Regions:
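Structural core segment of the AMP-binding/adenylate-forming
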Residues: 137, 141-226, 349
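Conserved AMP-binding/adenylation subdomain of ANL enzymes
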Residues: 272-290, 300-343, 357-363
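AMP-binding/adenylate-forming catalytic core of the ANL superfamily
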Residues: 149-174, 189, 338, 345, ...
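AMP-binding/adenylate-forming catalytic domain of the ANL superfamily
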Residues: 201, 205-207, 579-604, 616-646
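Gly/Ser/Thr-rich phosphate-binding loop
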Residues: 315, 343-347, 356-423, 437, ...
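Conserved AMP-binding/adenylate-forming core of the ANL superfamily
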Residues: 64-65, 82-137, 154-159, 218-228, ...
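Conserved pre-ATP/AMP-binding loop-to-beta segment of ANL
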Residues: 78-80, 203-206, 210, 216-253, ...
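Conserved ATP/PPi-binding loop(s) of AMP-dependent carboxylate-activating enzymes
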Residues: 431-435, 446-481, 520, 617-618
Length: 647
């Protein structure tokens, strides 16, 4: 199947995008009719509200109602809502919409009994289990604001989030599961609360069979015991709490360019409208079909496309607690797709690079029947053409790259399967979705011609679902996203458009690197390395990695007088990052160098160092202080075996 020969004339995309351009507010008013409102919005968009305007002002709704109740009310309660498939736990079970409603009502009642109400924050620090999804929905049901933190994140990172959003309660579990090991969550949670200035009133702990943990009297409650008690009391069955469309649904923290995380806020109304629209028009999925986002609920993909969008659309969503390889082999994804009749899958290119590495010929696919499988979507990092083409040839279905951010909550650019597929250009996530007016500009905010690389920006206002602000940080939002290019949202990505309007995203313009689809701050890692008593200065940059796309590589300069073995200090630095940021950083390369290359003004030449590490051609920077240092960097990389040529 050659995706490049598709005829764009068969797609309705141009017509739909033009309709949005002609009447953007009418377009989104029509999309909003697919949502159940308690009170319809008074204004589709109010340009005077918020920092760039707000969507569906005056509308009253509830996210949980649209994800669960409406389907039960429509007589579809016996349809599967969630398929839980955990090769790590050796468990599989299905929750119908009716069962999901019951569980969400019960947990909502439990949260109310813990004193949680409308507008209160709740941190969800959990593994990939159904209770994590139920926790998110239960918060939405009672009007509380959830903040999901990736299970197993380091205690210090969790503590900063506790202090920023000040949760009334934390929902967690005794442990998470990784291949060959159990990750204890409770000690991390206890340490985080000890580190944090803010103390939650209560913690609700799910005891998993793999580990039973001790509970702190007066603060911790046993999930199962409290659930059993709540089930006996009929008061747990209650209606959804009405909230404003502009009220926050959740806060999701993403890496900032400093050590302080950014709490991206998602509102209720716009989030539902955009995600519901995307399921049919972008992903081409119908209600009742099985949809699988192979991600984690701790990341934005998990929020939008494991939990909310499939449930808004009345689909069956797969919650997979496993890996693309090693649980048990590189055929794991094919088993899940085959066994559960999955129609559409969404994952990061990293997963397919791992499968390709373990099973380059795709021989394990022959064991499975993927008869219902129609489309594979990739996002979270740049999809390299080799991986995309390999997956397309193996699966014989369209493989669609698309591009978006934690801040937007859904695709900025994609190939809209529901409107008719456009020709694929490997390396491009295709075209702007309705709602996004994408421009490529230079440093002076002047628009650049086709083929010219520049900063990718989006003309304001951003569409529904995009963040209205960062949590209690309007000034920081303006500074981070709006001030540099007045009238535009700064994506902090660089790229270009071609003559057909296709967008090519080439990389980040700030210090955020993308490790296996996870956005991580090199600045944050540098802060940690600099805290080592023997380190004088350091630089962390993302270097190319065949499996993860990018991995961080740290260069450290030791303080004078330090005469300990370099290898010993480097191991301590690796352990320090693991402890302070977590294994998700994938930080394994620390290299001791005598000095770092800098400009005469003292700025570290990270871009040139990255090119050397990646084996790319580079030019001597005109502003360099001492050209000989770059040769020293190259030699240090070769000694460590960390340069691209050695890899």
């Amino acid at each position: 199947m050659d995706m490049k020969t598709k005829d764009s004339r068969t797609s309705r995309y141009r017509e739909v995008y033009a309709r949005w351009q002609r009447d953007p507010f009418g377009f989104w008013a029509e999309a909003a009719a697919d949502i159940d409102w308690f009170e319809k919005p008074k204004k589709v968009f109010d340009p005077a509200a918020g920092i760039y305007g707000r969507w569906f002002v005056g509308g009253v709704c509830n996210t949980c109602f649209n994800a669960v109740d409406r389907h039960v009310n429509a007589g579809r309660g016996e349809q599967p809502a969630i398929i839980y498939d955990s090769p790590l736990a050796g468990l599989k079970h299905t929750l119908t919409y009716h069962r999901l409603l019951t569980e969400t009502q019960v947990l909502g009642g439990m949260l109310r009994d813990l004193g949680v109400g409308k507008g209160d924050r709740v941190i969800v620090y959990m593994p990939m289990v159904p209770e994590a999804v139920i926790a998110m929905l239960a918060c939405a049901r009672i009007g509380a604001i959830h903040s999901v933190v990736f299970g197993g994140f380091a205690a210090r990172e969790l503590a900063t989030r506790i202090d920023d959003c000040k949760p009334k309660a934390i929902l967690s579990a005794s442990c998470g599961l990784e291949p060959g090991r159990v990750v204890q969550y409770k000690p991390l949670l206890d340490e985080a609360i000890a580190l944090a200035a803010h103390k939650p009133q209560s913690c609700l702990i799910l005891q998993r069979v793999q580990t039973q943990t001790s509970l702190i009297e007066g603060r911790d409650r046993d999930w199962a015991q409290m659930r059993d008690h709540a089930l006996i009391h009929a008061s747990s069955a209650f209606d959804c709490v009405p909230v404003e469309a502009t009220d926050p649904l959740y806060i999701l923290y993403t890496s900032g360019t400093t050590g302080r995380p950014k709490g991206v806020v998602r509102d209720n109304g716009g989030h539902m409208v955009a995600l519901k629209w995307s399921m049919k028009n972008l992903y081409g999925v119908e209600p009742g079909e099985v949809y699988w986002a192979a991600s984690d609920v701790g990341w934005v993909v998990g929020h939008s496309y494991i939990v909310y969008a499939p449930l808004f659309h009345g689909c069956t969503t797969i919650l997979y607690e496993g890996k693309p390889v090693g649980t048990p082999d590189a055929g794991a994804f094919w088993r899940v797709i085959s066994e559960h009749d999955c129609a559409t899958m969404f994952t990061a290119p990293t997963a397919f690079r791992a499968i390709k590495k373990d099973d380059p010929q795709g021989k394990l696919l022959a064991q499975y029947d993927l008869k219902k499988f129609r489309t594979l979507f990739l996002a979270g990092e740049r999809a390299d053409p080799d991986t995309l083409i390999w997956a397309e040839k193996l699966l014989q279905v369209p493989v669609i790259d698309h591009w978006w951010q934690t801040e937007t909550g859904w695709a900025i650019a994609g190939n809209p399967m529901g409107l008719g597929m456009l020709p694929v250009k490997p390396g491009s996530p295709t075209v702007a979705m309705p709602g996004y007016d994408i421009r490529i500009v230079d440093e002076g905010c002047r628009e650049l011609p086709a083929g010219k690389m520049g900063s990718i920006v989006v003309k304001l206002p951003l569409p529904p679902s995009c963040m209205p602000t960062l949590w209690q940080a309007d000034a920081r939002t303006r500074e981070s996203y709006l001030d540099e290019f007045p009238g535009y949202y700064k994506t902090a990505d660089a790229g270009f458009k071609d003559d057909d309007g296709y967008i090519f995203v080439m990389g980040r313009t700030d210090d955020i690197i993308n490790v296996a689809g996870h956005r991580l701050s090199t600045g944050g890692m540098e802060e940690v390395l600099a805290s080592h008593p023997d380190v004088a200065e350091c630089a962390v940059l993302g270097v190319k990695d065949q499996l993860k796309g990018e991995v961080p590589c740290g260069f450290i300069v030791l303080k004078s007088g330090v005469n300990r073995p370099h290898g010993e200090i480097e191991k301590e630095c690796v352990a320090l990052i693991r402890d302070k940021i977590g294994p998700v950083a994938a930080f394994k390369i620390a290299i001791t160098v005598a000095r770092l290359p800098k400009t005469r003004s003292g700025k570290i030449l990270r871009g040139t160092m990255k090119k050397i590490a990646d084996g790319e051609t580079w030019q001597m920077p005109a502003t360099i202080d001492d050209p000989a240092i770059l040769d020293e960097i190259g030699s240090a990389l070769k000694r460590k075996g960390a340069d691209a040529a050695v890899k």
